[in-house]
């Protein structure tokens, strides 16, 4: 692949249709890092661009892989690979490195999903069987898997259950060891699903 200095994302995508979308993503990321269009935040935006492009190409439905972790972990080699393209025009070594980053990120994502699934099954088994048809405790638990940091007021409003009912459910999850209070305050207390967050933090 040959990329001109002023090439845009759309032109790279258009001119390299014979290449796999992952290869095009590598070329786009390299070009963005070369142009550095912003005064600040180019690295973060460049890494975000990888995810957005893979989603736009239909390779991802959700942003579930974190390529940034591999790039940060191998930062010296990352910059060396980009510099080598600028120095010699050798895109192949850069594309190979980029594909290694995507492969590593995908493996990490699969591992995290498996851990989250096991955590889900483990904690579901801890929940007492509901005494009523409407299972507020299960509703709160399901909510936690999308919002692992909560406060009682906002959660009760979102789930459309009373403050006292939400407070009781939160207390139960704290007693079961699923939730943990992080504020140690009398009012406006915040609780976190620490085991869930720890899995998400790992590898980021």
Positions of predicted regions on the chain:
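Phosphate/pyrophosphate-binding active-site loops
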Residues: 1-114
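Basic amphipathic alpha-helical segments that dock to polyanions
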Residues: 144, 166-176, 191
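Conserved, hydrophobic alpha-helical core segments of structured domains
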Residues: 17, 23, 131-140, 163, ...
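Short, cationic-aromatic polyanion-contact patches
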Residues: 133-134, 181-204
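Short acidic, hydrophobic short linear motifs in intrinsically disordered regions
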Residues: 137, 141, 146-159
